[in-house]
């Protein structure tokens, strides 16, 4: 009888340990998001070489440190922010904005060679500062920052921007779509200011 009790205790301990491990291993699914491309003329790829003497160098994109994390940021109250742990950017926000900016401005400004690499002496040098790129408790996507553009004669122009794009639905999918739309609207406005 004495030998049965220790065996029973061992079986009971193993069973409880197995249950504990089984309950604690609930895997949380992570979702990864990328800024969408919604420009209608983006799909028109030229099959011929272009010639231009206009070069736009995207020198830097500085994203506020609280935004440049792997998790998507939400403003939960007037002075409170939270970074998502399971809804993440597929690449850093600064990298995604750089990629979008190069690709979209190339489409929007066909007379310019646009690159984040300094290929030659630039006609225009662009610095971008992002101070807001997040969801808000108001149900909007918030995009804020400023452009600093220097021409070849060292003339400097700045343009601040602030956009609130209403979400069409709840959730991170809707937030990223609203951020993408707001960003491309800002790129369009910036491109128009360069053309004129």
Which stretches of residues belong to each language-model region?
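C-terminal motif of bacterial Sec signal peptides marking the signal peptidase cleavage site
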Residues: 19-22
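Surface-exposed short loop/turn segments
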Residues: 24-43, 107-153
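Soluble periplasmic/extracytoplasmic beta-strand elements of cell-envelope proteins
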Residues: 55-60, 73, 125-130, 142-146, ...
């Amino acid at each position: 009888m004495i030998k049965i009790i220790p065996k029973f205790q061992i079986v009971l301990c193993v069973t409880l340990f197995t249950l504990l491990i089984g309950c604690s291993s609930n895997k949380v699914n992570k979702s990864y998001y990328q800024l969408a491309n919604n420009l209608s003329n983006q799909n028109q790829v030229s099959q011929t070489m272009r010639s231009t003497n206009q070069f736009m160098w995207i020198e830097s994109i500085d994203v506020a440190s609280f935004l440049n994390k792997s998790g998507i940021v939400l403003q939960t109250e007037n002075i409170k922010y939270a970074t998502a742990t399971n809804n993440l950017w597929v690449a850093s926000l600064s990298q995604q904005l750089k990629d979008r900016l190069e690709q979209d401005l190339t489409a929007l400004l066909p007379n310019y060679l646009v690159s984040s690499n300094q290929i030659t002496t630039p006609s225009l040098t662009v610095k971008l500062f992002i101070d807001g790129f997040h969801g808000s408790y108001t149900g909007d996507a918030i995009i804020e920052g400023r452009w600093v553009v220097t021409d070849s004669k060292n003339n400097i122009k700045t343009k601040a921007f602030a956009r609130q794009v209403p979400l069409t639905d709840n959730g991170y999918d809707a937030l990223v779509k609203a951020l993408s739309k707001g960003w491309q609207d800002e790129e369009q406005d910036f491109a128009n200011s360069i053309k004129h």
